[in-house]
Amino acid sequence: MLYNSPVHLFNARMSKSVCLFNREDLAKVYLPVGQMLQIDRVLSIEGPEIHAEMDLVGHWVFPLHFPNDPVFPGCLLIEAAGQLVAIWGWHAQLKGNPRMAKVSANFLRPIIPEQGVITLKSKIQIKRHVVRGNVQVFAGGELAAEIEPVIVIVKE
């Protein structure tokens, strides 16, 4: 269920989030959990825009993905972008379960652990139960990827 948590603090009538959401907060709502939760913090939600971060330092993927040449995998960037759009949908009080229906991605440069933090910024468009994000992914202060996830909110 989408809104089964007492920490659900989103309010669609507000122009901005009342607080920051950290990994612990996000794990209490309907999202992937454990290692598959890619978003570490939501910094702001204002109208159709959402801004979040994920930490690279100590991320579980680096020892496993090209251990001697660690590069953050594009599939996890796509997952993070989908989670970002789903979080915005919850903020807008869309009821149902989010499902990634389609995605396009353009990877511009590799992301490595020394860059410290990945920043995700998105502008959202919504039409009925379909939510589309235009997500820009920054690492080391530079644009690293552009991802366009399309999330369908499936009614319960």
What are these model-derived regions, one by one?
Residues 136-138:
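Core beta-strand residues in small-molecule sensory/regulatory alpha/beta domains
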Residues 33-72:
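Catalytic strand-loop segment that frames the active site of acyl-thioester-processing enzymes
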Residues 72, 142-156:
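Flexible glycine-rich active-site/ligand-binding loops centered on an Asp-His dyad
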Residues 37, 47-51, 117-119, 130-132, ...:
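Intrinsic-disorder/low-complexity, polar/charged segments enriched in Ser/Thr/Lys/Arg/Asp/Glu/Gln
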Residues 64-86:
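Compact, glycine-rich, soluble single-domain proteins
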Residues 11-12, 17-20, 84-119, 124-126, ...:
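Hydrophobic beta-strand-centered segment that forms part of the acyl-chain substrate-binding groove
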Residues 2-43, 50, 151:
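Flexible, low-complexity linker/boundary loops enriched in proline and small hydrophobic residues
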